[in-house]
Amino acid sequence: VDITRILTASTDQLDEQELTARALLMLAGAEGDYLTNAEYERRKRELENVANAITTDVLKYWSQNPELRVMPDITQKTMTDNRGQHSVLDELKIRIWDNRHQLSLPFDEHSTGFRWFFSFLAAFSEFEYSDDPVVLLLDEPALGLHGRAQADFLRFIQERLAPNHQVLYTTHSPFMVQPGKLERVRVVEDKSQDLGCVITSDFATTDPDTLFPLQGALGYDLAQHLFISPH
């Protein structure tokens, strides 16, 4: 993505990829003048600061592989317009270094789940320090994530968003239900044509299909205690 464009354009002028890149730079507290500075050492130091900040703030929540590290870089790309005029753009590229396998891959070549997780944390981290309380409504988030990554996603919400904001989400996944906090859960059941959908915290009156995610969450929690508990 064009670094100058994402630093200067308004939000409605940027696509999803550009918005994610800008959110990452804002999260890292990046200085635009340093990122585009002609002096190599100054530009390199700012890129390393960005890498450290993003790795610390985002990738610490990806427990499936704690040995990942963000590697942002800025390259120059020559563009030619319709009149044959040439211009040089500073292009931001993001790679992910995997210390476990001793290689790096472009961000776009990682799994859909990883890209979604990374992008969500980058975009929603801006709410952490917002002075205005907001209500975040998420419809079936983290669908493409492994069960462990869904637990990481909940940990991010619990630690970074929930202390200052209200977060509501819908889910059918047992891994998105916290067994120790069932008082927060509401189930939605389609009762009949006359009643329509009913939202309740009374699990005893709910049909088995609706209760399945809760049963799965409690069963997984019980299995974890049986296999992992020191007792």
Regions found by a protein language model. Name each.
Residues 46, 50-69, 73, 78, ...:
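Switch/communication elements of ASCE P-loop NTPase nucleotide-binding domains
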